[in-house]
Amino acid sequence: MKKILLSITFALMGIVSGFAAKAYSGIVTVTQSDGTELNVRIYGDEHFNWLTTEDGVLLVKEGNNYYIAETTSYGTLKATKFIAHNANKRVSAEIKAIKKQNHSRFRSYAIEQASTAKAMGTGNNGVKYFPHSGSPKALVILVEFSDTTFQSGEKAKTVFEHFLKGNVEDALPDGYEAYTGSYMNKNLRNKGSVSDYFYDMSKGAYTPLFDVVGPYKLNHSSLYYGQGDKDNTDALVSDACKAADKDVDFSRYDADGDGMVDLVYIIYAGYPASMSGNPNDIWPQSGPGNGSFGTYDGKQVCRFGVHAELNFGWALNQKNGFLLSGIGLFCHEFSHTLGLPDLYPTVDASKVDNQNPEMWDLMDGGEYTYNGGYCPTPYSPWELDVMGWTSPVEL
């Protein structure tokens, strides 16, 4: 029975092409143009996502402000003229606009859109998963934009080499002081590197290697690649590979000789849309995409991952100092490149019996454990078994 269940699991995993990080489940505080602070919640993932106030009012972001949303006859959202406020600061006109929101209509639209988006990504396009044994090598490209640079500047390479493959006993790397919030507060630092996490999970059987290059400045703005619901990640991966091509021999990253680079990972300057509350930021994700991102040194780039430099969003970083990203998001998306699926619903689960593991599993909300993913939840026994890193006793 166990072997049958595992076979079904791998079959299901094989039909999914694109994965994305779950939205951060906590409160994100943003600052409106009138000087007020607004508490925002993020829902969904890269395929379909939306924003509400802390008490569930639907929002639309336009420019630098978050507005109370109007529900159209199709279930879509558009901004009203009312800047949103927390419940204790609303005037009567805002309350009237809120009462007109049709949550049921929007929920139906959200379910349809999320299902359609995921169906469009169906199919693994013959792209193999990244190996989950031994010491396979992945290429990591650091990129910044015309309007957004790494807080650590040219030292970003040193910072992210430590992030990916440093030892927990190592001193903080040169450049880490740029992340003032993490530098000054030990509770806002990673408790180990990505390599540490997978070494611990596999009991030493799996030690992925990460070659870090860059940072490279791309010609476009961050908004060009984020674009809210018009996510332009394909262009981000392609442009990053083109920028790195002069320095990288991509053929070194095709270990099995199938003509495809085993994995290219992009770490970009700025914030993740899954945590920032800004839908124009880029959403961390991974997958084989919908085709090749180009051919470099005779090898096609197909399997990719995307990760942000910083944790949370602009407002929190301005208040508490810049916060380096937690390894949790990276470990979650990297686990997708190994073949593990998401274990969370992306639409309103109020009509179903939600038995998801939430913060107890890396592939659900456990990517954000400990102040935003600085000490992510370990793999579950099922995930360890699927990866071949443990042999549970059958009862």
Regions found by a protein language model. Name each.
Residues 263-265, 269-395:
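Extracellular hydrolytic enzyme modules, especially secreted metalloproteases
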